[in-house]
Amino acid sequence: MMATHWTGLPEEDGDKLKACGAASACEVSKNKDGKDQGEPVSPSEDEPFSWPGPKTVMLKRTSQGFGFTLRHFIVYPPESAIQFSYKDEENGNRGGKQRNRLEPMDTIFVKQVKEGGPAFEAGLCTGDRIIKVNGESVIGKTYSQVIALIQNSDTTLELSVMPKDEDILQVAYSQDAYLKGNEAYSGNARNIPEPPPVCYPWLPSTPSATAQPVETCPPDSLPNKQQTSAPVLTQPGRAYRMEIQVPPSPTDVAKSNTAVCVCNESVRTVIVPSEKVVDLLANRNNPSGPSHRTEEVRYGVNEQASTKAASRTTSPASVPTAHLIHQTTGSRSLEPSGILLKSGNYSGHSEGISSSRSQAVDSPPVSVNHYSANSHQHIDWKNYKTYKEYIDNRRLHIGCRTIQERLDSLRAASQSAADYNQVVPTRTTLQVRRRSTSHDRVPQSVQIRQRSVSQERLEDSVLMKYCPRSASQGALTSPPVSFNNHRTRSWDYIEGQTEATATVNSESQIPDSNGERKQTYKWSGFTEQDDRRGIHERPRQQEMHKPFRGSNLTVAPVVNSDNRRLVGRGVGPVSQFKKIPPDLRPPHSNRNFPTTTGVSLQRGIAQDRSPLVKVRSNSLKVPPPPVSKPSFSQHSLASMKDQRPVNHLHQHSVLSQQTQFRSESTFEHQLETEVSSCLPGTSAKTSPQLSENLGTSDLELPAIPRNGDINLQEAEIQQPDVLDNKESVILREKPQSGRQTPQPLRHQSYILAVNDQETGSDTTCWLPNDARREVHIKRMEERKASSTSPPGDSLASIPFIDEPTSPSIDHEIAHIPASAVISASTAHVPSIATVPPSLTTSAPLIRRQLSHDQESVGPPSLDGQHSSKTERSKSYDEGLDDYREDAKLSFKHVSSLKGIKITDSQKSSEDSGSRKGSSSEVFSDAAREGWLQFRPLVTDKGKRVGGSIRPWKQMYVVLRGHSLYLYKDRREQTTPSEEEQPISVNACLIDISYSETKRRNVFRLTTSDCECLFQAEDRDDMLSWIKTIQESSNLNEEDTGVTNRDLISRRIKEYNSLLSKTEQLPKTPRQSLSIRQTLLGAKSEPKTQSPHSPKEESERKLLSKDDTSPPKDKGTWRRGIPSIVRKTFEKKPAATGTFGVRLDDCPPAHTNRYIPLIVDICCKLVEERGLEYTGIYRVPGNNAAISSMQEELNKGMADIDIQDDKWRDLNVISSLLKSFFRKLPEPLFTNDKYADFIEANRKEDPLDRLRTLKRLIHDLPEHHFETLKFLSAHLKTVAENSEKNKMEPRNLAIVFGPTLVRTSEDNMTHMVTHMPDQYKIVETLIQHHDWFFTEEGAEEPLTAVQEENTVDSQPVPNIDHLLTNIGRTGVLPGDVSDSATSDSAKSKGSWGSGKDQYSRELLVSSIFAAASRKRKKPKEKAQPSSSEDELDSVFFKKENTEQSHSEIKEESKRESETSGSKQRVVVAKESNTKKDSGTTKEEKKIPWEEPPPPHSSKRNRSPTLSCRLAMLKEGPRSLLTQKPHCEETGSDSGTLLSTSSQASLLRSSTKKSTSPETKHSEFLSIAGTTTSDYSTTSSTTYLTSLDSSRLSPEVQSVAESKGDEADDERSELVSEGRPVETDSESEFPVFPTTLTSDRLFRGKFQEVARVSRRNSEGSEASCTEGSLTPSLDSRRQQFSSHRLIECDTLSRKKSARFKSDSGSPGDTRTEKETPALAKMFDVMKKGKSTGSLLTPSRSESEKQEATWKTKIADRLKLRPRAPADDMFGVGNQKPTAETAKRKNIKRRHTLGGHRDATEISVLSFWKAHEQSADKESELSAVNRLKPKCSAQDLSISDWLARERVRTSASDLSRGEGLEPQAESPSVLGTPISTHSPPSQQPEARVAATSTLASTSQSPLFTPPQSPDQINRESFQNMSQNASSTANIHPHKQSESPDTKAETPP
């Protein structure tokens, strides 16, 4: 609407006089300058400033410039309109005058005046329209030229300005002109984007005669506003008056083209809509404007400059928004305005026309093209000092002045336009619709166009314009440019609905006051421009339509001359309009299919664009527009915008057009019925239609395309003459024959203008216009008051627009006009043209149709198809049938869209005319009403519900038209109960119900959107209701037939399916409902039935499940969902259809033949309804339903009925999609590429990895590539809504990774080892979808963070290890769980077997996942609740875990450094023993947190560890922070794994709690587990490193021996009962976890305890160090993987397994990690400032190192409690078992190294603590007793223990030196209890025992630090370490959810 949208400086050019006004009447401007608006001049000749006189101001340039900014406010006609103009030329429309090309109405006005600036001093005011710059008229100049003139002016700038009140565009689009727009453009004029090509020169070429109705004095004011406005106004004034003058009319048209925006604005200015226009403009600018732009772009069929068109469209869209409202009142005005536009007054024309129109109506066709003295007055802009006066005198003033005034004017103008009759009412109606349309399409263009369309309907030309208007609506601005005459009308809609009104008014008014004039204008003007106006103007309108629609929908083009345009959503109507001769036109009005088709197309287009249809209806029914105008304008604008984009869609254009076509036909029919009285109603109906279209456009479009095409073709064929007339007013043509009737009169009036029909007819039209105006005003008032007279209007104005739950749906729906829907419903496309007459004939039906259409719009114009069948039910069904026949798949696809649901809502409201706002008003004439017992059989989700679910309710039922309203109270009639929105009985099936209920006198009502039971008091009452409802449902014969057939066929299918499914009846209703829902988009209870509602979806899901299976199976299904899912997946339907078939053999999607239809449908459905559905794709669907759907789909996709209830269950749909990919014989990532993908994913370099993946993806077969691209985009869309659906890319990757990235053969090894890769690949694909599927030249993706999370967290080495372990998949499930450990022992690096076993475990665990998790949770909960130790453990866990990790890491590092390969070997064996692996894991985790242990830093790698630990602190923490998310994410997908793992962990942790040693080993294993969570390899490596380095040679030997005994740790664990550590272990409590834990912990742990005590700081530190470095790296790499896996149960299991397995790989990793640990320690040293925790941790760790240095016995002494022994694994075999369980549990929590990161951070803290411990040793015991941090809990026992530890640590550090220190870190890495002094450890042990996870962890970590420090100072660290401990100790983690939560990175 505003140039701002497309113009670079729409709002302001900049501080430098940015002329932000639209150069609306460039040519007019010339006229304005030199000519009197009153004097007839060619548009170019007329000075836009012929108005009483522009004010001249002299500005002196200053350094600040001239002190004002300009705004170029442009109401652009769509490029399609411009093309229409060309078409007009081609069709002989006055030689295709350029003026006919809708030129953007623009106004360059002063946006701001800087106070104190030259402009301010000169008196320049905001809103002053620039008419001349330095004496040079701006008319015909581009904004940049104007700016250049200003900028190039000398020191003095002479500006001729027109007051704001005189600027039509500003007046009409006051809000848009000021509220919307781009920021001030402060650049050179040359840089100012030029608006879309404006045919200003063309305007001048327009015959002056028409434009000359120089009464454009007021237009002058407009021209002042709009540069061309003045001329336009002048001409418009004349044109308005001269609207009667046919020749001037062409000129006006030219001007109209120029002044399109102006006209639009004028219309708005003149008409009440201006206020709404402003509002709408604001709306439109935001949504509508862009929408217009979008639409124009989408429809940019004829958009010469898509961008410019969009700009114009946007600008016009803004204008039309207001314009729609304006149109409502200014509909008639618009017609005169159209004349004015033709006159060539661009700006002035709009406003003038609006004004003139009113005046024209009021005044006789005196001097200028005005119909009446008012017209004369209007014409005489000069007579008024201000446009305001002019308007005031003109009465359109109400509409022209302020928006409020215009709104008032709309009402008044409707009446006043009653003078105009057709014009104003039409315009009002059009404005309402138009506003929506213009809002959607091109603000002004659309609005004007709507007006024009209305007018065109009112008048033949107007009807043509109506179609163009529709086009305008579609591509509001551009279309006006297209036609000259038609364009004028279109411009009337677009640039000035005023113009359209003027044109129509001319036509309409001509019959009234200037019947002759109208003919003169339309006929006279068109007489000379008869072809031009009838043919030329109509073509022009068509062209306009085309541009508008072409831009938006290409509707105009479609309407104009070819079905292709119709396909574009405008061609058909355009051609009809263009070619409709007067002769043909009457036939059209007589239901000539050609004519009807033309109108229908136009309307379809309008409806497609919503406004267009509305416009059409509006023209026919003026009264409705007022009501519908406000409501529809806003909603329509919103929905129109959406619609417009939808319209841009391929099918939608055609569908919408077709639907609109039909709707228009139907509307025409109805309108004809109510020509005079229903003309306003028609407008209202049109508005509803528009609104409805908005609602249903999306669906309708798909359905419409084929039907629409047929309709267009037939229409075109039938109306070749119509093409000649080029009149979009096929409806009007009908009025030719039916001119006697008010609507026919209006039609005739339009026809007269177009076909040069006799003035008498025009007069007749005029009378209808007057009557219509009165009716329109009344109806507007009624509508505003929720009146019932124009149901369509009310609905369009309020309900339909409001009803669409989702804008997108509305947009889509809007695309399919109600009439188009009706047309579609109309079995005969050709009869679409005929149908409009029918529509006209049955105005009330039209209302319903409108409401119905709007609702139907969602279902691709199914309801709309049957215009007469206003209810969506019938028309929808019929349309559905037609669509099925014509575009079945497409339609179904559309129906699958959300729009369908909206359609339902709209449908519901359709019947009520204005169900929400004016249900009672609309249907005040209730056919029947009374109290009935009501019970819905089908929920909003389309699911059948039992009586208990939906009890009977007593409702006051009111049957109005096709709507059945249910009220809880008779007094609530105005407000239908929320649950019972109006039920559309159109084409409903009603019968006596015997089976649904035992009650008597119950009849069942089945509609397209609902199924319900009603119980009457007695049989007679029931039969009476049935009869009444049947009659109401058959109001539209055509629709009813189709709909009933559809319902019946659906019912039959449903019954058949139900018979097979046992739930026959319920399912049938549900199915029908679902069908209706899908097609219509909503149930009869649209509110409750939001397709996007997750709850509804879930309910629907449940219902659908019930549907698919007998209700008795519900419990079974629920209980057996997992088994069912497996069965479903196992059950592979015959590969005859969709599932189990190669991608290239699958039925292709309609949009992309390389994408399977099922994928397209499922994704679309999910995107439509499931984006906000929590857990979409995660929550499985009903297996029975999935299997059933698979079978059906395999039978044939052609039978897919997305409306079926089973398609309502998002979970089923999502599961269906997953099942499809799972069943693909050739995986999406093909078998031959699978290995490459896995390998690529493991690349170290993130960019290289991504590039390789991209290359591989692009190397996929085309079907696979396209499907993957589509699916990735879909998943990305889903992930983008992760805040609501909780499905982040990681979660989606977990869900889809194994499904997409797999091999045809189910290889457990691959499943296990490659799962992280699969997750990662899919996650990466989702995250970088845009990059992956762009051209090679695309910039590199941002992989730093992502790669760190995904690639780093999942290092290739880990994968390799997993692969190697995979070779050892022969392990039992329990072994599998342990196999990670044993495998790592065996293949020390081959994590594959562990993963294989893990995968097996996953299989088992998946079965027991829920149970395991549940058990795990209770255990975790129970364990933490041990005692104060529990609290300590909570903090100590974190702190101690970190500390112990730090020690372990340091020790591991030292050991790694010292032992290196030796440790590797040992670790290999140790890894065999779970203790070692656990230790390794702990150490690995600790390395991340190693910085804290000062001992370790003192020792071999103490510095390194410090640095690394510091780094780990920071890095690991972040990782941990990340990990928790991953873990959480993975928790869903990894539920099975985590469940089983956790279960085993619980077992082990239970045992672990018994023995501290077990805890220690568990801790280690946990660390390993954590590490291995996502990247199993990493975890295993960590474990190995940690174990080997951490464990002393003895321990290692023990581990080796144990490894020998149990070749696989898992075997040993299994034998020991420790399988819990592995994922399987958790799943398989069978393994004596206690035994395993005891043995491992006793043997290994004792050794470890000794070695750890000796080497806890040394060997363990070295191990930790060694493992730490790699573990850090790998962990970092693994984090994302871990997160992913953690999300996945399998991942958790894997991590658990890997944790166990990591023992052996840990050795290898120790070396690898050694550097990392060293780095970490260095980092720790550098970044020791982990916090006070680190300092205490280090000092404590030093003390603890001393303690560890002390002999184990000494340490045990220090820790006299049994827990200390347990920690060491000395005498706590039982605890060891428990500990093992806990370890396993914890490991599950830790999965994927979540805890590793935490532990690493803890280790960092521990280092710091150890260092501080050294210092602390110097502190007094009391000081030490004091908590180092507030987080630290002061425990006397802990303090004593720490003191002991400190003392022992000091001794140890002195005695053992670095070795003990290293040991201490190792100890830190190992369970703290093992390392902590005996005294402390017992305490810790107690805590651990009591809290298992919490206490154990805290004590475990406490030892590395002095007990005091660990417990006190380290408490913070422990709290931090608790997470790390939790990470390290899976069982502990399981034990303590807190720890788990903390643990996740």
UniProtKB/Swiss-Prot annotation:
Source species, domain of life: Eukaryota
Modified-residue entries (Phosphothreonine), positions: T741, T1504, T1669, T1902
Region spans: Disordered: 26-53, 210-229, 326-365, 499-519, 573-647, 674-702, 852-879, 902-921, 1080-1120, 1373-1396, 1412-1632, 1649-1794, 1846-1945
Biased composition regions of type Low complexity, renumbered to the chain: 347-358, 1377-1395, 1531-1556, 1569-1589, 1887-1896
Modified residues (Phosphoserine): 42, 63, 454, 610, 619, 851, 856, 875, 918, 920, 948, 1093, 1109, 1412, 1426-1427, 1656, 1729, 1906
Chief location category: Golgi
UniProt-annotated location(s): Golgi apparatus membrane; Cell junction; Cytoplasmic vesicle membrane; Cytoplasm, Cytoskeleton
Protein keywords: Cell junction, Cytoplasm, Cytoplasmic vesicle, Cytoskeleton, Golgi apparatus, GTPase activation, Isopeptide bond, Membrane, Methylation, Phosphoprotein, Ubl conjugation
Record field: transmembrane: none
InterPro entries cross-referenced by the UniProt entry: PDZ (IPR001478), PDZ_6 (IPR041489), PDZ_sf (IPR036034), PH-like_dom_sf (IPR011993), PH_domain (IPR001849), Rho_GTPase_activation_prot (IPR008936), RhoGAP_dom (IPR000198)
Cysteines joined through disulfide linkages: none
Domain PH: residue ranges: 925-1034
Site (Arginine finger): R1178
Modification Omega-N-methylarginine, positions: R549, R569
Chain residue ranges for the region called Interaction with ARF1 and ARF6: 924-1091
GO biological process: regulation of endocytosis; signal transduction
Polar residues composition-biased segments: 499-512, 589-600, 674-696, 1590-1599, 1658-1681, 1729-1738, 1871-1882, 1907-1927
Coiled-coil residue spans: none
Function recorded in the entry: Functions as a GTPase-activating protein (GAP) for RHOA and CDC42. Downstream partner of ARF1 which may control Golgi apparatus structure and function. Also required for CTNNA1 recruitment to adherens junctions.
Protein name: Rho GTPase-activating protein 21
Classification of source organism: Eukaryota, Metazoa, Chordata, Craniata, Vertebrata
Encoding gene (name): Arhgap21
